[in-house]
Curated annotation (Swiss-Prot):
This is Short-chain dehydrogenase/reductase ATR9. Keywords: Monooxygenase, NADP, Oxidoreductase. The gene is ATR9. It comes from the Eukaryota. GO terms for molecular function: monooxygenase activity. It comes from Stachybotrys chlorohalonatus (strain IBT 40285).
């Protein structure tokens, strides 16, 4: 099996949820991990948790806010800080950052688009523009974005987010052509129980159980389930321009 041990990875949005799970698994595989998020406190908390779970982990934390329109310069600053701190170019970039709070079509306005565009529409393209300058330009290297099941199977009430992930899927394939031999892929999760569901509570547990009971597997995905797909895409040096689904069979229902 191909190894990623000793390689260097930056996870943008790696302080919680799926990104934090990817960071944990990567540390366990002996990867040098850099985690970036908009909240310094969450980054520090995530690092402490991962270091407790994987004592031998090589992990650093950084802060970056990609919700503003000057995100290109913010990304350039982040990538420079990471390669300076780790002592060399990156092998992999993973982007899991997102808010998950897009409005419904009836509430959608041009202002709502302007507020969500930097993170959900512009950031992936800017990562594709900026990241290669700080990466090993080789087919072993990869960029992996985070898409969503609504891009392939929309649901009523989720038109806006379906449009965003549909655009990301198209960008993923186009960037695979533009950035070759660096591989570009995306993971498309279905419903996944992360912090975005809200704080732990009995009511949340019941809601998650009810939603899971309707799925093909009788459960919802967990960050650790979906994180496996990102690790796979880093390992598989023959995959590019691909959207990998991790949704519990949602497209079959």
């Amino acid at each position: 099996m191909p190894t990623i041990r000793g390689q260097s990875i930056l996870i943008i949005g790696g302080s919680s949820g799926i990104g934090a799970a990817v960071a944990k698994y990567a540390c366990g595989d002996g990867v040098k991990v850099s985690v970036a998020s908009s909240n310094k406190g969450r980054v520090e908390k995530a690092l402490k948790k991962i270091q407790a779970l994987v004592p031998a982990s090589e992990i650093l934390g950084f802060t970056v806010d990609l919700s503003q329109y000057d995100l290109e310069s913010r990304l350039e600053k982040l990538f420079k800080e990471v390669v300076d701190a780790t002592g060399g170019p990156l092998d992999h970039v993973v982007m899991t950052a997102g808010t998950g709070n897009m409005v419904s079509l009836s509430e959608y306005t041009a202002k709502a688009f302007q507020e969500s565009a930097p993170l959900h529409f512009i950031a992936p393209l800017m990562v594709g523009k900026v990241a290669p300058r700080f990466m090993n330009r080789h087919w072993k290297s990869s960029i992996t974005f985070t898409s969503g099941a609504f891009g392939k199977k929309p649901a009523k009430g989720y038109c806006v987010i379906a449009s965003a992930v549909g655009a990301l899927d198209a960008a993923t394939r186009a960037l695979a052509l533009e950035l070759a031999p660096i591989r570009v892929n995306a993971v498309s999760p279905g419903p996944t129980v992360t912090e975005m569901f809200g704080p732990p509570s009995e009511a949340l547990d019941k809601a998650v159980a009810a939603m899971g009971a309707q799925s093909l597997l009788g459960k919802l995905g967990r960050p650790e389930d979906v994180a496996e797909a990102y690790i796979y895409l880093m390992r598989d040096a023959n995959t590019t321009g691909t959207i990998v689904d991790s949704n519990g069979g949602a497209f079959l229902q």
